[in-house]
Amino acid sequence: MAIDFKDTFSLMQAVERMKAPASFLLDTFFPQVPAVATSKKIAVETRKRGRTLAPFVSRGASSVNVKRSGSKIALYEAPMMGPSTVIDPEQLDQRAFAENIVSTMTPAQRSAQMQAEDLSYLQGTIINRKNKMAADLLTTGKCKIEGYADDGTTVLTDEIDFEFEQDITLTTAWDQAGADIYNDLKLASEKIQENAGIVPTVLVVGKNVEKYILDNASINKFLAIPNRENISMFSFAPEYLSPQVRYVGRIMSLNIDVYAYLETYQDAEGKVKAFIGDDAAVLGVPDRGRQQHAAVTLLNDDNQFTTYAGIYVPNYYANKDTQELKLTVYSRCVLIPETIDDWATIKTK
């Protein structure tokens, strides 16, 4: 069925049918997608797990009230993402990418094809942005939001801070001969277990850290003696699961699966950067975080404001003065961890 690019609801349905590109950090740590909020503001509540002991009472005495684990709640206006593409008549007179050299495609057909491709492309840029938000939260506990004012050049900066405190400081860097990587991971796991009450099972590392682990003397000391106890501790058989995602192996004694995440993004200045730093590592509990989306309000063709409760809200605009078609995809999203103690960051070098 053809897509009606002039109708926002039709475009929203089309995006929902599209298969979203994979995003390792989002899929691993923030896979839950609750219903979209009906306003642009989202209540973000964070908490630390309590460890209160039940009080004893003497015979015949009544109960004793205990204090609940506290939480902090903040009301955020979910940041708006709004990438767009523009099509003008000159583009329609040229052969599209991968189109036959000798083509019978009309400009109208080429326009429909380009807009369908743009719809998928714009969705991908939003997912990349959410993946960057996930990387920032996992490595710093904060998410810096930089947007542009109406002039298109002035940068406005805001920040969502979850007051994250689980940075692991190492006594010996992992690229050094005396590094005890196994014990460092054990201590980091125990810290998460103590504060979050759950065993972390996923370790995501930058591209250099895989080599540090596989070359580490303290780990190879166990592997060099192939007895039953040592073999049951580690299993390393690196393989690519997808482009830029490499499964390194499993540390069975700590219940940890190790992944090297090599994916990069291009910043506003055109520089290529890694989502996870080359020497960074994140140990965490998977499948608990949420992607909370908020409603988007747009001006419709009748010059009235309409609110759309959707994850992705495409909008089509035709300007007859400039003879341009603009397709924009809007999305409001805040990433919310279940608890702020679900992960720990390790600067390995």
Locate predicted features.
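N-terminal alpha-helical "arm" segments
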Residues: 1-43, 336-349
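Assembly/oligomerization interface modules of large self-assembling protein complexes
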Residues: 32-101
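A general structural signal for short secondary-structure junctions and capping/turn motifs
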Residues: 34, 192-197, 202, 316-319, ...
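Extended, non-catalytic scaffold segments that flank or surround catalytic motifs
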Residues: 50, 55, 154-164, 179
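Long, contiguous amphipathic alpha-helices that act as assembly "spine/axial" helices in icosahedral shell
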Residues: 83-163, 184, 190-208, 323-329
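Glycine- and small hydrophobic-enriched segments that form the cores of compact globular domains
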Residues: 163-180, 187-190
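Ordered core of a single globular domain
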Residues: 183-240
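Sequence/fold signature of self-assembling virion shell proteins
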Residues: 219-349
